[in-house]
Amino acid sequence: MKYTISYKYPHKHFIDIDLLIEDIHQETVQLQLPAWRPGRYELSNFAKNIQRFEVFNEKGQSLKFKKISRERWEIESQGNTKITVKYNYYAAQMDAGGCWLDENQVYINFIGCMMYVPGREYEACTVKMEVPKDYQIACGLPKKGNTLMASDFYHLADSPLIASPSLIHKSYKTDKNQFTIWIQGEVNPDWQMILADFKKFTEEQIKVFGEFPEEDYHFLYQILPY
C-alpha cells in the first residue's frame, strides 16, 4: 500500500489522501476504513469524516465503485492491475484518537483515516507526507525524507504523527534503546528535569520487564491552550 497525504486549505481541515493499490488480480477490490483504534474497546465512526471518494486507473479514467457498508467500499477493477483511490478526510478532532489539520500542524492517527484492502493487511506500507519544507515530522515509523515506512498496516495503525514547524524535541538513551520526546504547543519545558525523569522511569520499566521491544521509540505530546 502506498499512501500520499497532502492538503490545499489547512483552515478548512480537509486532508487529501491518495492510495495506490498494485498487483490487483480480482474483478473487484474492497477497501475498509477501521472502526476501532488501539487502546479503545468501542466502535468509532471515522467514516463520517470521508467527504469525497474517487477511483482512477493508470490512464486517469474513473472506475465504478459502491459503498457496501458504513466503512467499506467495493471497486470494479475492470481488468486494471493498478488503481489510485482519492478521498478527503475531515481532520478537526483534537484528542488522543483523532486527526487535526490547521495552519500550524498536521496531526494524524492513521488508524482513523487510512483505508486498507482486507486480506492484505500484512503488506508493507509507505506514507509520503507532502508538507511545507520547514515542517518537522514526529513519528515512530522509520522514514526517508518525508516518506514513512511501515512493515504492515498494523505497524502504521500504531504510529501517530505530528508534522509542524514549531515542534521541539530532545532525545535520551538507555543501554540499547533511544527515546525521543516531541512537544507541539506553546511551552517552555525544563528539559533537564524532563529528561532525567523520563530516563528514570524508562530504565525502571525495562528493568522490571527485562527488555524493551523497540530500538527507537518516540513520545508525542500535544500541549493545548485549553
Put a short name on every predicted segment.
Residues H218:
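Active-site acid/base region of carbohydrate-active enzymes
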Residues M1-P10:
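N-terminal, polar/Ser/Thr-rich
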Residues I15, L20-A47, M115-P132:
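Surface-exposed beta-strand/loop patches in extracellular or lumenal glycoproteins
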Residues N45-Q51, F56, Q61-F201, K207-E215:
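Non-catalytic architectural context of zinc metalloproteases
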Residues H11-H13, H25-E27, K67-E71:
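Ser/Thr- and Asn-enriched, surface-exposed coil loops between beta-strands
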Residues P225-Y226:
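Catalytic zinc-binding patch centered on the HExxH motif and its immediate surroundings
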